[in-house]
Amino acid sequence: MSLSFVPHFFQQGSNSYKPLLKHSHHQEVTMEVGGNEFTEITLRPLDLSDIDAFMVWATDDKVARFCTWDAYTSKADALDFIKNKVIPHPWFRAICLNGQPIGAISVTRNIGNDECRGELGYALGYKYWGKGIATKAVKLVANTIFSEWPHLERLEALVLVENVGSQRVLEKAGFQREGVLRKYITLKGKTRDLMMFSLVSTDPQS
């Protein structure tokens, strides 16, 4: 499985969002992960005590491959990121398997005339790809974000065209494929095409 192109939440120095009060609610869903083993996928705020779990996926080049950020090599840099970017972020959650963080997901809001739109980003530890976990996490966000942010009418996700796995995740979560944005971003030294996906508040929940 491939992961989403993550627009902002791992990007060092990004400050495109307008801070809001942080939400502390805890979302849960029970799902089957292989065979008959039932596990809980939950979303919760990520904090400094999660640094060791964070480093597992944030230092992995396979995870960072499709994202705007390079794999972390310094625990100090990762702690600084969590303290100064994650904790103040208006909607950033750890994706947890049985309470243990294995990835992260965020919604970054726009401001001004664009406040009706938000941008989804996510990353998941490589060993958990292909198990339906990312799809479950995206569904959890999609089923609650519009009620949490009444101004939000559209949730977008941008994915590299070669990132077929993440495109499947979004489609399974109810997002619509809108088209290709050609030569849309310079990513890791190369100009890349992105696929735009969207979910609007009036779409039926999946």
Residue ranges and their predicted role:
Residues 61, 85, 147-148:
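Generic structural signal for alpha-helix termini and adjacent loop/cap motifs
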Residues 48-55, 75, 79, 83:
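An amphipathic alpha-helix signature
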Residues 82-94, 103:
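A short helix-loop-beta-strand connector motif used in the catalytic cores of GNAT acetyltransferases and
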Residues 62-82:
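Conserved GNAT-fold acetyl-CoA-binding loop/helix
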Residues 5-57, 95-206:
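Acyl-donor (CoA/ACP) binding surface of acyl/acetyltransferases
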